[in-house]
């Protein structure tokens, strides 16, 4: 059976593993987009590391959790946002100003809403972590 939204399934697996106190989780399939999202999460300390494992079927990510994730999820549909509108989405998905990140894909790559604001670029919303 195919997965309808592999990124949503992976974010849910990360949240569930964190809620149960696990220090590692394996998610599949491994995609380049989700790998870029994991890099952003690692930059902000939400995960300690990850490794892509090629199993010949679609790959897997072995993710080491830091225990700092309260909630994470995807934003569907992937809304296009301008840099001026990022604050309204921040209010909608994050519990407080400066607490957590919204991950978005831009013409300059996958980054947090803070980095996008500094660079002055908009993009499509992918998910949130806090």
Swiss-Prot record:
Reported function: One of the primary rRNA binding proteins, it binds directly to 16S rRNA central domain where it helps coordinate assembly of the platform of the 30S subunit.
GO CC entries: ribonucleoprotein complex; ribosome
Assembly, per entry: Part of the 30S ribosomal subunit.
Entry keyword set: Ribonucleoprotein, Ribosomal protein, RNA-binding, rRNA-binding
Official protein name in the record: Small ribosomal subunit protein uS8
BP GO annotations: translation
Pfam families from the UniProt entry: Ribosomal_S8
Family named by the database record: Belongs to the universal ribosomal protein uS8 family.
UniProt-recorded Gene Ontology molecular function terms: rRNA binding; structural constituent of ribosome
Tagged with keyword Membrane: no
InterPro entries named among the record's database cross-references: Ribosomal_uS8, Ribosomal_uS8_CS, Ribosomal_uS8_sf
Domain of life: Archaea
HAMAP family: Ribosomal_uS8_A
């Amino acid at each position: 059976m195919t997965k309808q939204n592999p990124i949503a399934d992976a974010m849910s697996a990360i949240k569930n593993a964190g809620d149960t106190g696990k220090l590692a989780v394996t998610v599949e399939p491994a995609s380049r987009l989700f790998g870029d999202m994991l890099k952003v999460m690692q930059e902000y300390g939400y995960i300690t590391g990850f490794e892509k494992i090629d199993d010949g079927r679609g790959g897997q990510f072995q993710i080491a959790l830091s225990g700092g994730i309260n909630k994470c999820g995807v934003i569907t549909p992937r809304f296009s946002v301008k840099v001026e509108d990022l604050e309204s989405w921040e209010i909608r998905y994050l519990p407080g100003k400066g607490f957590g990140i919204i991950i978005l894909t831009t013409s300059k790559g996958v980054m947090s809403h803070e980095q996008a604001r500094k660079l002055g670029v908009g993009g499509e919303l992918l998910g949130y972590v806090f």
